[in-house]
Amino acid sequence: MTQITPQPGIMDIALYEGGASKVDGLDTVIKLSSNENPLGPSPAAIAAYKAAAGELHRYPSTDHAGLRGAIAEVYGLDPERIICGAGSDEIIAFLCQAYVGPGDEVIHTEHGFAMYRISTLAAGGTPVEVPERERVTDVDAILAGVTDRTRLVFIANPNNPTGTMIGGNALARLADGLPEGCLLVLDGAYAEYVPDYDAGKALVESRENVVMTRTFSKIYGLGALRVGWGYGPRHVIDVLNRVRGPFNLSTGALAAAEAAVRDRAYTETCRAENAKWRGWLASELAALGIPSDTSSANFVLARFASPEEAGACDDFLKARGIIVRRVSGYKLPAALRMTVGDAEGCRALVDAVAAFKAQAA
């Protein structure tokens, strides 16, 4: 037997399963499983990516100054307190790598994003799951779960896969209730879908224990390029830059992301279209007897009567070329997460769910 063994915790990591993209036997599908922007990226981002092709022989920027400057301008932030990564996943990994080790604990909520647990285990730490209250983050449960070994607390707000969120006062109470030496990480992957929401800016700028993360994979439609960023206290960003590789983002990704964030009109179009069809989708599902919590993201968590009904509906949809997401791995076996698609995709989804309910009656 081999004596080559991984570090403790590594083999406790379940392989991440992304949303399916294909259905065997079908050439065309409607993919509503990965919370992607159905409108795609800004035309300006596509043009910038193409233009970057002439520089493929050059190493990319090491400090991401152009992208950090654009983010700072659009969001009203200090560019020196921004760090960029290959998706917000990498920022999450940096945080665990830098602040978590054997014996340390990291808190995440019951239905929180899977990468919190994965990155914690990869760093040798212990993930601690705390309950939610009816699929909503419970600040009191988090504070009750904190020990002298807690180093990070991850909150997705809005949360994936539930779509629920808590307000600024609750977040401030959480930040103030954490002990010294513990960072609160606000994952704002879906924050751009919430009007007039800073996703943590005020908390970051008024406290030394709060970091916020964002992604270009959702409203900006750049999931294939893997770009994310974080904003935090100077001392935290300095630490994260010490573990960040010097060329972690490609020239094309940097160019496309900068163009995307500057195209505010296109972003607003995407936000408005999502709000319109998200409301329509939730209403139509409710009329079919399928409830969902109020979503602040670009998906709806459809709740069925049982895991069996959810599974049967998933199979029914797949047979018709519509792919949604089972979320049993998030301890929601009786639910399906349905990305808000374009008009055609949403109508096709509702028609198929209606047909499923009719044949099951």
UniProtKB/Swiss-Prot annotation:
GO terms for biological process: L-histidine biosynthetic process. The keyword Nucleus does not apply. Pathway: Amino-acid biosynthesis; L-histidine biosynthesis; L-histidine from 5-phospho-alpha-D-ribose 1-diphosphate: step 7/9. Transmembrane segments: none annotated. Keywords: Amino-acid biosynthesis, Aminotransferase, Histidine biosynthesis, Pyridoxal phosphate, Transferase. The keyword Nucleotide-binding does not apply. This is Histidinol-phosphate aminotransferase. InterPro entries: Aminotransferase_I/II_large, HisP_aminotrans, HistidinolP_aminotransfase, PyrdxlP-dep_Trfase, PyrdxlP-dep_Trfase_major, PyrdxlP-dep_Trfase_small. The modification N6-(pyridoxal phosphate)lysine is found at residue 218. Belongs to the class-II pyridoxal-phosphate-dependent aminotransferase family. Histidinol-phosphate aminotransferase subfamily. One of its GO terms (molecular function) is pyridoxal phosphate binding. It comes from the Bacteria. It is an enzyme of class 2 (transferase). Its cofactor is pyridoxal 5'-phosphate.
